[in-house]
């Protein structure tokens, strides 16, 4: 083994396994790119993103931690969302919840 080397176990790693998912269509109506991080409360994203915000309430992107999805101006794409976990309390972001979901 080399110092600092990481030897991963064989097989696949399942991320967010067993969590209920929904897929929604999102359009960027703005003139600037919008990037949304993995743990951002999706319902509170940039108002220039057009999608069903009620369906997205209490959910985040189903992507690896620390990554993001970028929406270019005029772009429409589908994203998969999973429920926020833990205490299911949301504070900050765009201050639209500020408490329990």
Swiss-Prot record:
GO annotation (BP), single: urea catabolic process
Source organism, top-level taxon: Bacteria
Keyword Disulfide bond appears in the UniProt entry: no
Keywords: Cytoplasm, Hydrolase
Catalytic reaction equation(s): urea + 2 H2O + H(+) = hydrogencarbonate + 2 NH4(+)
Listed GO MF terms: urease activity
Pathway assigned to this chain's UniProt record: Nitrogen metabolism; urea degradation; CO(2) and NH(3) from urea (urease route): step 1/1
GO CC terms in record: urease complex
Enzyme class: hydrolase
Enzyme Commission identifier(s): 3.5.1.5
PANTHER family xrefs: UREASE
Subunit structure: Heterotrimer of UreA (gamma), UreB (beta) and UreC (alpha) subunits. Three heterotrimers associate to form the active enzyme.
Protein name: Urease subunit beta
């Amino acid at each position: 083994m080399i110092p600092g080397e990481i030897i991963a176990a064989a097989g696949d790693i399942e991320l967010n396994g067993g969590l209920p998912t929904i897929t929604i269509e999102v359009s960027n109506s703005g003139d600037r790119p919008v990037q949304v991080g993995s743990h951002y409360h999706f319902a509170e994203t940039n108002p220039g993103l057009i999608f069903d915000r009620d369906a997205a309430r209490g959910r985040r992107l189903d992507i690896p931690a620390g990554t993001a999805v970028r929406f270019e101006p005029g772009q429409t794409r589908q994203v998969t969302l999973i429920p926020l976990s833990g205490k299911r309390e949301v504070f900050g972001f765009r201050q639209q919840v500020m408490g329990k979901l």
